[in-house]
């Protein structure tokens, strides 16, 4: 057996540099290189290498630039498979193409511009393949052996007991809390010397009752009293002439800065100096004054702690007290949060900052648990508005003009009438979110129920216009940043705490909830195994196995393509219409998607309609016409239903098939149920292999076209030209491909999306599977691009 580059010979046998394991002899080595772990890492390394070769590094764009805008721009150079934004937002992005040749085409362009700014585009940095050390990750996370925990869980007699054991394994111990308290006292003493009357206030996981081993120590340096002290000192014109040298050195730090006028960056630099020079054991001090939330980071050697100090984070302190209150109101909250956090970490949904892509943070996950408990019947926890009404006058609180009022003590809140145990509630959590329509919903802990996405679709400017001019809370009028998952902070109501997530993470969370819900229905979850097998939480915490992953390709046999609802990527005019439509928004959006899908088939791919699109709408039998005002003048989107319901007639290519008429009427007249629109049906024919060789044709067109850097119609125009070139140059199919497409909008008890189901009716040449495979990625992206560009097209017309 010839050794490959990953295998190194040692005195005691062999060492696999890829898997970081020692192997005693050659037979064991042969087994190792054929094993699942080694083969998996080989595939993963090859995949990472391909991703690097097919990607470019992009910077220089505006901070509010969306993934959709970047994707649309770079689509003109090749098929974009993914756009990964940096976690701080607005600094850089990685644009991944389907082929490395597309990267060369992109880099060959002398200049790239987007939204008036010149982009910096360069090849993606090639990094040596390395798996993050588990030990390094664990020091920032749970620092427990899952094998050891599983052993303890299997000894438990019930799921309820297992959940309590999870809490005991993960929670901060009393000695850890005491160590943190001592460090807070030390910092208080030191900073009081320099900032008289200041306060060091701990917040976050260390004190919110959900702390984990080795979690960071978050601190808020409150300087309000110090500002008053400094103002008094100036007014009395006190001097330091009679002070000792040591006192003068300390006072000189404060005298060098006016806290009332100093910038946060200046104050943070001063905080960093004090930490470096005056606090024993502190090292690795770093002031991050340009971050979204300016902070000073530090480490303490002897205590093995990492800490953050902020100077303007009162809302976070109030959030911490809110979580403390919720834990005190009902003792079931803490065990559920610890269990669900560990489950989410094991499924790579949350907690692991080195994981793939943006993940749920622990705060967002905790709010999801609280919201679920607010929606039990009867509720386990009250809404924030209900808590506000239970507070007394002395407990009223407003921070940065946000109402943060709630009782200071749990005994002010009546106990819940809900008697469900932890086992049932955990099952209920997965059931609740497995059926949750994340794209069309906004989670509101303040209201205690879901808010429709249409309430947030108006632009900030429109919201400001409609806001009460006399309102003392202008921040309420600004809208939260919408995304695939929308979870409002209970107090800062324009902050989406899950705004960092992308569609992939939201889908993964929903999928894992569905899998967990199925498992929790089984006896393996509910009853202890009499044969000593894994049961209950042990199997629930198991990472997704390769066997489970291998079962996913079966779903590919279902000929379906989905277009997800992405309100953030829609043009402003359409967002305003959807907002006005309220609960009927799905019908309007469905019409837009169908119009875009028709344009992809009819204009971009040059498919021909063979019979009129038929709808099963409940219209008057004598005939009807449905008009939907969308205040836009898109070409070829005028679609009309006339004549008797169910009748068909041949259509010319120019007319195109459809069900709806989207006109420029000034008022809406709806003759069908837009809240639950009926399915649409198309039948198309295709006489050319328009899916074959598109990348090569696109590259050739970019090389020969004078408009390569700025195609007039963007990627939509370019894809149309690619199709036309294929139709003109390539041999046509001997027998035309004919296929049916059924379009249906779903939502409510599942994520809002348009599902397109395909049925090949004539496929003599056996090419439909290739065509469908091409459409799986091409059709949703092009439809979303067309809808996202609609406003620009209107402006140009």
UniProtKB/Swiss-Prot annotation:
Its cofactor is Mg(2+); Mn(2+). One of its GO terms (biological process) is snRNA processing. Keywords: ATP-binding, Magnesium, Manganese, Metal-binding, mRNA processing, Nucleotide-binding, Nucleotidyltransferase, Nucleus, RNA-binding, Transferase, Zinc, Zinc-finger. GO terms for cellular component: mRNA cleavage and polyadenylation specificity factor complex; nuclear speck; nucleolus. It is found in: Nucleus, Nucleolus; Nucleus speckle. ATP binds at residues 205, 319. Mg(2+) binds at residues 216, 218. Residues 615-624 have a biased composition (Basic and acidic residues). It is an enzyme of class 2 (transferase). One of its GO terms (molecular function) is RNA binding. Residues 611-659 are annotated as: Disordered. Residues 421-495 form the PAP-associated domain. UTP binds at residues 216, 218, 319, 341, 363, 495. It catalyses: RNA(n) + UTP = RNA(n)-3'-uridine ribonucleotide + diphosphate; RNA(n) + ATP = RNA(n)-3'-adenine ribonucleotide + diphosphate. Binds 1 divalent cation per subunit. CDD domains: NT_PAP_TUTase, RRM_TUT1. Residues 54-126 form the RRM domain. SUPFAM superfamilies: Nucleotidyltransferase (SSF81301), PAP/OAS1 substrate-binding domain (SSF81631), RNA-binding domain, RBD (SSF54928). Residues 627-640 have a biased composition (Polar residues). It comes from the Eukaryota. Belongs to the DNA polymerase type-B-like family. The zinc-finger domain is required for terminal uridylyltransferase activity. Together with the RRM domain, binds the 5'-area of U6 snRNA. Associates with the cleavage and polyadenylation specificity factor (CPSF) complex. This is Speckle targeted PIP5K1A-regulated poly(A) polymerase. The gene is tut1.
């Amino acid at each position: 057996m010839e050794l490959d580059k990953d295998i190194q010979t040692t005195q005691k046998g062999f060492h696999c540099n890829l898997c970081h394991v020692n192997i005693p002899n050659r037979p064991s080595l042969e087994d190792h290189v054929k094993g699942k772990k080694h083969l998996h890492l080989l595939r993963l390394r090859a995949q990472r290498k391909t991703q690097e070769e097919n990607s470019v590094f992009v910077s220089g764009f505006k901070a509010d630039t969306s993934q959709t805008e970047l994707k649309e721009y770079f689509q003109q150079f090749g098929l974009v498979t993914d756009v990964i934004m940096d976690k701080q937002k607005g600094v850089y992005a990685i644009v991944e193409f389907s082929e490395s040749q597309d990267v060369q085409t992109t880099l060959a362009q002398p200049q790239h511009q987007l939204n008036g700014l010149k982009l910096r585009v360069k090849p993606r940095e090639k990094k040596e393949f390395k798996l993050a050390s588990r030990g390094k990750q664990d020091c920032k996370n749970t620092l427990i052996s899952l094998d050891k925990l599983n052993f303890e869980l299997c000894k438990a007699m019930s799921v309820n007991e297992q959940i309590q054991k999870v809490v005991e394994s993960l929670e901060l111990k009393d000695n850890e809390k005491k160590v943190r308290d001592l460090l807070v006292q030390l910092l208080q003493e030191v900073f009081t010397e320099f900032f008289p009357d200041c306060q060091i206030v701990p917040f976050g996981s260390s004190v919110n009752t959900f702390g984990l081993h080795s979690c960071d120590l978050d601190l808020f340096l409150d300087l309000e009293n110090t500002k008053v002290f400094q103002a008094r000192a100036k007014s009395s014109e006190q001097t330091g002439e009679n002070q000792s040298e040591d006192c003068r050195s300390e006072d000189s730090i404060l005298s060098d800065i006016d806290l009332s006028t100093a910038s946060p960056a200046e104050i943070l630099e001063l905080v960093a100096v004090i930490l470096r020079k005056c606090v024993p054991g502190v090292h690795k001090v770093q002031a991050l004054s340009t971050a979204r939330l300016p902070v000073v980071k530090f480490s303490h050697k002897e205590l093995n702690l990492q800490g953050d100090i902020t100077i303007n984070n009162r809302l976070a302190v109030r959030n911490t007290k809110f979580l403390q209150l919720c834990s005190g109101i009902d003792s079931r909250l803490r065990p559920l949060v610890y269990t669900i956090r560990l489950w989410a970490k094991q499924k790579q949904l949350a907690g692991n900052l080195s994981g793939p892509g943006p993940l749920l943070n622990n705060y967002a996950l905790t709010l999801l648990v609280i919201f679920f408990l607010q929606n039990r019947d009867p509720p386990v926890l009250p809404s924030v508005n209900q808590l506000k009404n239970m507070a007394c006058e002395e407990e009223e609180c407003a921070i940065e003009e946000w109402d943060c009022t709630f009782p200071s003590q749990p005994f002010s809140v009546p106990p819940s009438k809900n008697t469900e145990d932890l086992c049932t509630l955990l099952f209920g959590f997965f059931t609740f979110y497995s059926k949750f329509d994340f794209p069309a919903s906004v989670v509101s802990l303040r209201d205690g129920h879901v808010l429709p996405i249409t309430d947030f679709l108006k632009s900030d400017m429109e919201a400001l216009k409609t806001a009460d001019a006399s309102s003392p809370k202008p921040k309420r009028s600004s809208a939260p940043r919408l995304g695939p998952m929308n979870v409002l902070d209970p107090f800062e109501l324009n902050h989406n705490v899950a705004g960092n997530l992308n569609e992939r993470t939201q889908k993964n969370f929903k999928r894992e909830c569905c899998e967990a819900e199925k498992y929790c229905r089984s006896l393996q979850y509910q009853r202890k195994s009499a044969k000593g097998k894994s049961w209950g939480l042990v199997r629930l915490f198991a990472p997704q196995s390769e066997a489970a992953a291998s079962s996913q390709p079966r779903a590919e046999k279902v000929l379906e393509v989905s277009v997800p609802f992405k309100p953030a990527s829609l043009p402003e005019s359409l967002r305003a219409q959807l907002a006005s439509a309220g609960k009927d928004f799905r019908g309007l959006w469905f019409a837009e998607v169908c119009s875009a899908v028709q344009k992809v088939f009819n204009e971009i791919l040059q498919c021909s309609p063979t019979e009129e699109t038929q709808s099963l709408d409940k219209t008057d039998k004598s005939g009807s016409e449905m008009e939907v005002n969308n205040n836009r003048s898109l070409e070829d989107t005028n679609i009309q239903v006339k004549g008797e319901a169910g009748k068909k007639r041949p259509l010319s290519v120019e007319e195109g098939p459809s069900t709806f008429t989207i006109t420029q009427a000034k008022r809406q007249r709806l003759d069908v149920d837009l809240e639950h629109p009926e399915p649409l049906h198309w039948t198309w024919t295709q006489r050319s292999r328009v899916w074959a060789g598109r990348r090569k044709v696109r590259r050739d067109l970019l090389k020969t076209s004078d408009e390569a850097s700025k195609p007039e119609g963007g990627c939509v125009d370019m894809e149309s030209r690619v199709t036309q070139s294929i139709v003109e140059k390539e041999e046509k199919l001997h027998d035309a491909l004919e296929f049916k497409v059924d379009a249906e909008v779903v939502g409510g008890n599942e994520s809002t999306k348009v599902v397109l189901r395909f049925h090949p009716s004539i496929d003599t040449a056996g090419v439909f599977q290739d065509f469908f495979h091409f459409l799986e990625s091409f059709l949703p992206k092009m439809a979303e691009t067309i809808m996202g560009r609609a406003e620009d097209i209107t402006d140009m017309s």
